[in-house]
Amino acid sequence: MGVRITPENRQPVHISNSFRMQATSAETNVISISAGLGLKTKVLTTFVKGSPIAQFIKNDLGRRGIDYEGKEVEQGGPWGYRHQFNIADSGFGLRAPRVCNDRAGEVGRTLNIKDFDLDRIFGQDGAQVLHLSGLVAALSHETGVFCLELARAAKKYGTKISFDLNYRASFWKGREAELSAIFSEIASVADVLIGNEEDFQLALGIKGPEAGGKDIASKIESFKAMIMEAKKRYPNVEVFTTTLREVVSANEHLWGAISLDGDKWTVVEPRTIRVIDRIGGGDAFVGGLLYGKVKGWDAEKCVHFGWACGAFVATLLDDFGLPADEEQIFGIWEGNARVRR
């Protein structure tokens, strides 16, 4: 885990002198939805011992209702370990957001399966869902093994596995063969597999539509074909899903989703949403989808709730969302912004 530093008032980083800081990670962005709605959640991570940033992260997780477990690693001096810094502005109008990840000495790269009691976590504690991010799987050789062993243990105990591919070219450079094997094995045991068109093509080698671009609604059949190809390669996956995003401006996006649950397709045609900050919207979609799965909802309801969670987080300054209740999220899906008194 790390922190995100964001200029106030949507200003660019290079001319700002006033910033806000939040704890962040793709995984905790996902589970914040369930935590906010009262489900028990935990993140497996690692901390720098005695670091005020580590304490800031712990405090932030606590206010969200997220439990945490992980080793305290000695910093090792001023050039040793630390928590990553994600420096990102929100953009405005036609000025796009810019993100700079500073991961030098990131303590998360030391995550080791030996530091966790998997029999307790999946057996005694009875974790229902394990969510993995490709960001962590690709951080280092150790974290790749960590995610792989977590997936194997979860499968052994019957825990559902969710895997968001989250491909990052800079993480993969020079490690393509190693990471392709790890990602493919995790995907083969996953129950829910998430990724955009770039993720499926570059992480798993499955052909799909051109990444980004305009008129994304016209590419829905291409997305479906990509998912069907993924289903042939990974027949044990129960749910394949991808979000659709077309950027009109930094403040306005077209937001949609496609999901194949068993043999049932659910398609949310891209709809206009207003955006305060885009980071975390995809994670919130996954969080809403998984919340619905744990609650036993049908496939369509899960996807609609996930879409609305993503739209909800786009209205927030934080990368994560803590819904007041399910009604708030379903109100977004229904397009009902009337004041509630």
Regions found by a protein language model. Give the residues of each.
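Short catalytic helix/loop segments, enriched in acidic residues and glycine
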Residues: 10-30
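Charged helix-capping and loop-helix junction motifs
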Residues: 116, 144-149, 175-184
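A short helix->loop->beta-strand "cap" motif at the edges of active sites that frequently abuts
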Residues: 155-160, 234-238
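Positively charged, low-complexity intrinsically disordered leader regions
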Residues: 1-13
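Conserved post-catalytic alpha-helical subdomain immediately downstream of the catalytic base
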Residues: 250, 265-335, 339
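Conserved phosphate/ATP/ADP-binding segment of small-molecule kinases
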Residues: 171-263
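Alpha-helix C-terminal capping segments
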Residues: 22, 29-42, 63, 292-295
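Conserved N-terminal subdomain of the carbohydrate kinase-like
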Residues: 40-134, 329-341
